[in-house]
Amino acid sequence: MCRGLNNEESRRSDGGGCRSLCTRPSVPVRCELCDGDASVFCEADSAFLCRKCDRWVHGANFLAWRHVRRVLCTSCQKLTRRCLVGDHDFHVVLPSVTTVGETTVENRSEQDNHEVPFVFL
């Protein structure tokens, strides 16, 4: 899911992968129901879930079915831009918003580009 080890390597066109370089895998995030490896984060429930528990919880009724779940990176366990809405066959890749700000008042030629992930409200 992540870009890999090479800075020059570009992400796949379907996007949504981790923006950082995943050179060191982090400690796996645990599912809050079964204690397995979590693969999604539900913002509405504020819960990390594995695929099996996610299907069970969000298949319970039509209200839970509409929750947007963020997919975790398989290497670094950070949230990616890939989201699940409803069925696991329906993936959404959130756009990112780039803001440009000047670093100093004296040196106006230097600018920082900050990329902020889009989040559903």
From Swiss-Prot:
It comes from the Eukaryota. Keywords: Metal-binding, Zinc, Zinc-finger. One of its GO terms (cellular component) is nucleus. A zinc finger (B box-type) spans 26-72. Induction: Circadian-regulation. Peak of expression toward the end of the dark period in both long day and short day photoperiods. One of its GO terms (molecular function) is transcription cis-regulatory region binding. Highly expressed in shoot apical meristems and in vascular tissues of leaves. Also detected in petioles. GO terms for biological process: circadian rhythm; regulation of DNA-templated transcription; regulation of flower development; response to UV-B. This is B-box domain protein 31. It comes from Arabidopsis thaliana.
